[in-house]
Design a protein with these regions (language model features):
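Extended substrate-binding grooves/exosites of carbohydrate-active enzymes
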Residues: 2-368, 372, 381-384, 390-402, ...
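Non-catalytic C-terminal accessory domains or segments of carbohydrate-active enzymes
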Residues: 393, 404-427
Length: 427
């Protein structure tokens, strides 16, 4: 005997090119992440509990959408999204380029059929995806070869669109483009799917972060009637790296906050942006990468071993309905710095994340005063002394008094070697 147990979920949904996403008649901005099934020292071979942990991390963050990318993943991922009410899109691995053969076309169509039939009964699935950045690695740049390549890619796309709509007319289709809209327009790919997904990295791979919102507005104007989602965005963030003058490609926690704050604010301003999936839930192995950590793409809001970065707390504070108070830089518990005050202290900034209106920070039982929360966090200039420093944050939301504490060991270095108050001990 063989047995299949299917979940039952009753819901109705729709996408609108002007007003975004609606679930059971209520407007919902989809905010979430993409995800690779990758883990520290384990690669892709994960036990069920690690898959479960990832979906719980997304739920805890306040995310309501998971882009299962760029391939169907373990069934336990889908099971958890069904149980936790997380909207999902699932896609087949047709990524970066096509092979101009009928065998490639046939295989792609078969993958699309298998994907839909595998997860057809999943109530969490509302989008089927089938191409990601398909012109990122074009083998040709001009002439007849490029024209033929475009024509074949369009043929594959239309075959996949038709296949998915025939297999499942109740759900939406989506294709994810990269930041070269002209390529996709020339091949007519912007016309085909029901949802346009845009992978945008202005302020990271592209220099001007403000080009992000200009591209959103252009897409909304040019592709009238098309639903728009931001399917990828995000900078690399190494939790070991900090900067008090954050800038593009420094991989600092601080630039990660600057970037994500800008993107989230711009997307929330625009009701026509139906949703977004930041890249990525977790850091993941990528052999060709030569970033802050070799062979690792560290755009995740959590690390390979799932330690939470500051950008995770930023999103949790922005998206959660529960009262939140968290002192940031939690992994940076052993610090050092040069004396920069007359009181023989070293001032360094520390973010405090909260959805309260204001927060008060105490350092070694001395108040640094209260600060208004702006864009989900307040930044305090903390005067560290040598040795152990106790940070305590206090905030009030309604009837809830919130507290968070963090102990930091600080190595104070004199501004001059002859400073008797801060004796020189090490290089």
């Amino acid at each position: 005997l063989d047995e299949v147990v299917n979940p039952l979920g009753l819901r109705w949904f729709k996408f609108d090119s002007e007003k975004g996403f609606f679930l059971n008649g209520k407007g919902r901005k989809l905010i979430g992440t993409a995800r690779h099934q990758d883990y520290f020292q384990k690669g892709n071979a994960l036990r069920d509990e690690l898959h479960v942990q990832d979906v719980l991390l997304l739920k805890e963050m306040g995310g309501n959408y998971l882009r299962v990318s760029h391939y169907p993943q373990d069934p336990v991922i889908m099971e958890m999204c069904d149980k936790l009410g997380i909207v999902t899109s699932v896609e087949i691995p047709v990524v970066n380029a096509v092979t101009e053969t009928e065998e490639f076309l046939h295989n792609s169509v078969e993958m699309a059929k298998e994907m839909v039939r595998q997860d057809f009964n999943r109530p969490s699935v509302m989008i089927w995806g089938y191409m990601n950045e398909i012109f990122l690695r074009r083998p040709y740049t001009e002439g007849k070869q490029l024209e033929d390549y475009y024509r074949f890619t369009e043929k594959v796309a239309r075959a996949l669109e038709a296949t998915i709509r025939e297999e499942d007319p109740s759900r939406y289709t989506m294709m994810a483009y990269h930041n070269m809209p002209q390529y996709y327009e020339d091949a007519h790919l912007t016309e085909i799917p029901m949802i346009q997904g845009w992978n945008l990295y202005q302020g990271w791979y592209e220099p001007d972060i403000n080009e992000f919102q200009r591209l959103l507005d252009r897409a909304h104007k040019v592709y009238k009637g098309k639903v728009l989602m931001v399917t990828e965005y995000g900078p690399g963030v190494d939790p070991r790296v900090h900067s008090y003058q954050p800038e593009r490609f420094d991989f600092s926690q601080e630039y990660g906050l600057v970037y994500h704050k800008h993107y989230l604010n711009e997307m929330m301003k625009r009701p026509f942006v139906a949703g977004s999936s930041l890249w990525n839930l977790n850091d993941f192995y990528s052999e060709s990468r030569v970033d802050a950590v070799p062979h690792v793409n560290n755009k995740g809001v959590v690390g390979l071993n799932r330690e939470k970065k500051d950008v995770y707390w930023f999103y949790k504070t922005a998206l959660s309905r529960r009262p939140i108070l968290v002192i940031g830089n939690r992994e940076w518990k052993s610090r050092g710095g040069v004396v920069n005050t007359a009181q023989k202290e070293c001032i360094q900034s520390v973010p405090v994340f909260s959805n309260a209106e204001e927060v008060e920070l105490f350092v070694n039982n001395k108040s640094l005063g209260k600060k208004k929360i702006e864009d989900n966090y307040a930044l305090f200039d903390v005067p560290f002394v040598g040795g152990e420093n106790l940070l305590e944050a206090v905030a009030v939301t309604g009837d809830n008094k919130l507290r968070d504490m963090l102990r930091i060991q600080f190595q104070l270095v004199g501004s001059q070697l002859k400073d008797e108050a801060v004796p020189f001990t090490e290089l």
